[in-house]
Amino acid sequence: MIPRVMSVASTDSGGGAGIMADLKTFTALKVFGTAVIVTLTAQNSVSVKSIYELPLKFIDDQFDEILDDIGTDAAKTGMLYSSDIINEVANKFIQYDVKNIVIDPVMISKTNVRLLKEDAIDAMVNKLMKISYLITPNMPEAEVISKTKIKNYNDMKNAAKIIYNNISTNVLIKGGHYNSYFSSDILYDGDEFYEFKMKRVDTKNTHGTGDTLSSAITSYLANGKKLCEAIKLSRGYIEGTIKNSFPMGKGYGPLNHFWVIK
């Protein structure tokens, strides 16, 4: 049977990130994607105009309709926005004993708009992350979660260890915000550090890279890949989406999720 993967996240009316990016990734990597939408956003390549939270009952209904019928082999979260939504999502994951949960703790948009309320951080860390298999914060998000500053590679390793010691979950810190010739991600599994390095591509068409990476990892986990292999394959896929990206709109352009489809 084709692997089943669920995204629990928000829409992006501009099509580059959020559930739109997740479903494109699932399709490109040949898994069956389902979606629980938690907020609607009005945004494009240069701004986020408004955010609308969906009622918790409707979020519950989406979970129930998917998991009572189709089921899932893995799940990922993206923008969840509020503590009420985060607590509800965590409760549904527990209720259905969902495995292979990947948390992308989306906090700030590419256009510098807050996508996670300040008072929701505690629920994100202490309720949702603690039931996950992997979290994938970028450097600014890792600073918030670890309550430390990250200025270099060693700081990334230190932050990853602090986070792991708090939540006992695999931590992948994405190094895309670190200004260097290479983009290095750091995985810490509680015992070892693993580095995943990629030459930086000179383009501003990077909208949705975090969503896409976490979706790709989730897809490979659903296919039975081990964590390090899933990350390595996902970074190869991401490199292709960036190298084959295209301009769309006046700001940060989207990735080309379908570059792998011949």
Where in the sequence are the language-model features?
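Short, small-residue alpha-helix embedded
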Residues: 20-23, 143-144, 203-227
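Short pre-catalytic strand/loop immediately N-terminal to key active-site residues, enriched for Gly-Thr
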Residues: 8-14, 193-207
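Phosphate-handling active-site elements
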Residues: 29-34, 193-194, 220-234
